[in-house]
Regions:
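Sec-dependent N-terminal signal peptides
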Residues: 3-11
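Electrostatic cytochrome c docking/interface patches
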Residues: 14-36
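Glycine-rich, flexible loop/turn motifs
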Residues: 17, 21, 54, 112, ...
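Generic structural signal for alpha-helix termini and adjacent loop/cap motifs
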Residues: 47, 81-82, 106-109
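Flexible coil segments in periplasmic/lumen-exposed cytochrome c-class electron-transfer proteins
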Residues: 88-135
Length: 135
């Protein structure tokens, strides 16, 4: 596992921080995250991620403005440490990363060729950006 992380480090160090617009997850990872989200998250956050009485939305403007400029690492840490509400810290890092990949796909961030990592330091290099940067 350490070797995989070391092999990916140059990709993240090329030009500093990446954003959620840089294809930071794969379609396959998002597909794995979909049933995990349905099982672990949808009862509170709704099937369409629109939120519920006690749970905020995980899609759209409110979600994106709350996380804009923060890192995917911070988001994954929040998920890991506080969710599911009835059993925090019970899901693996891989499960949380797959759910986050699904969340990114529903928020219409593009998929890429490399899976969203589970390593916290690598995830801190990925910024959540609500607006697509101009090139």
């Amino acid at each position: 596992m350490k070797w995989a992380v070391l092999l990916l480090l140059p990709m993240f160090a090329e030009d500093g921080a990446r954003t959620t617009w840089d294809g930071v997850y794969t379609d396959e990872q998002a597909a794995r995250g979909r049933p995990l989200y349905a099982r672990e998250c949808a009862s509170c956050h709704a099937d369409a991620m629109t939120g519920g009485e006690m749970a905020p939305p995980l899609v759209g403007g409110e979600f994106l403005s709350n996380w804009n400029g923060l890192s995917a690492g911070e988001l994954l840490d929040r998920m890991r440490n506080t969710m599911p509400l009835n059993k925090p810290k019970s899901l693996s890092r891989q499960t949380n990363a797959d759910i986050l990949a699904y969340m990114l796909s529903v928020n219409r961030f593009p998929a890429g060729k490399t899976e969203l990592p589970t390593d916290g330091e690598m995830l801190k290099q990925i910024k959540v950006e609500a607006m697509k940067p101009e090139k």
